[in-house]
Amino acid sequence: MAAVPDTSDMMTYCSGNENDLFFEEDGPKQMKGSFQDLDLSSMGDGGIQLQFSHHLYNKTFKHAMSIIVAVEKLKKIPVPCSQAFQDDDLRSLFSVIFEEEPIICDNWDEGYVCDAAMHSVNCRLRDIYHKSLVLSGACELQAVHLNGENTNQQVVFCMSFVQGEEETDKIPVALGLKEKNLYLSCGMKDGKPTLQLETVDPNTYPKRKMEKRFVFNKMEIKGNVEFESAMYPNWYISTSQAEKSPVFLGNTRGGRDITDFIMEITSA
């Protein structure tokens, strides 16, 4: 069995410049060839110069070990790149490593939904005939003409921008009465969609994801606004031509029912 050379023998054999390893039939000799002779780029001080011999017989274990050391050093030599590493190269690498898969959410527990910061504005609404909306009794809105000293009866809405179905020209909002636990909502009564004021828990409302009965799609038309029920499409917050009539949910646009409102943003 061949004896394994001692580490010190190997270090002695590779003494001097450890990168200068030459291989011939009889062992290390003077340099007769290099990578520079092969018209390769200069590798600086870390270059390894080799002399290749076609005589493969009579090689010792030391020769084999030296070749292994040389090959391992060659692996560590940086290869010049014709251009800098680009973002596209990184994307190509990621596409090989990772496989893109769609994320499908069939349903989720609303108890774990974290509401984003609510955006809301205070506003007053009048129909295009300048009737203001006032609170009559405990839970009814009426449209009346106000002037002078009674203008302070006009209701101030806190209009919150909420989550709704994706629409390009419709903005989902909820309309609550400022400083009151009342919100406009839609329900069914005697087989017909109706508008009502609903009392809510102030510790829970408003919230980003409101129940659909509270949601209205706000649309701007020629400087005015319309509010369409999200629960009952094509039904709108409406007023009547008559004075002191209740505000209701109607499905007639451009007729006797008034669906266009003037919105005034206020800080009050």
From Swiss-Prot:
Alphabetical list of InterPro entries matching this protein: IL-1_CS, IL-1_fam, IL-1_propep, IL1/FGF
Site positions per UniProt: Important for interaction with integrin: 170, 178, 180, 189
Name of the encoding gene: IL1B
Entry keywords, A to Z: Cytokine, Cytoplasm, Inflammatory response, Lysosome, Mitogen, Pyrogen, Secreted
GO-annotated biological processes: cellular response to lipopolysaccharide; cytokine-mediated signaling pathway; fever generation; immune response; inflammatory response; positive regulation of canonical NF-kappaB signal transduction; positive regulation of cell division; positive regulation of immature T cell proliferation in thymus
Subunit record text: Monomer. In its precursor form, weakly interacts with full-length MEFV; the mature cytokine does not interact at all. Interacts with integrins ITGAV:ITGBV and ITGA5:ITGB1; integrin-binding is required for IL1B signaling. Interacts with cargo receptor TMED10; the interaction is direct and is required for the secretion of IL1B mature form. Interacts with HSP90AB1; the interaction facilitates cargo translocation into the ERGIC. Interacts with HSP90B1; the interaction facilitates cargo translocation into the ERGIC.
Protein family according to the UniProt entry: Belongs to the IL-1 family.
GO molecular function terms listed in the Swiss-Prot or TrEMBL record: cytokine activity; integrin binding; interleukin-1 receptor binding
Name assigned to this protein: Interleukin-1 beta
Extra facts: IL1B production occurs in 2 steps, each being controlled by different stimuli. First, inflammatory signals, such as LPS, stimulate the synthesis and promote the accumulation of cytosolic stores of pro-IL1B (priming). Then additional signals are required for inflammasome assembly, leading to CASP1 activation, pro-IL1B processing and eventually secretion of the active cytokine. IL1B processing and secretion are temporarily associated.
Pfam families to which the protein is assigned, alphabetical: IL1, IL1_propep
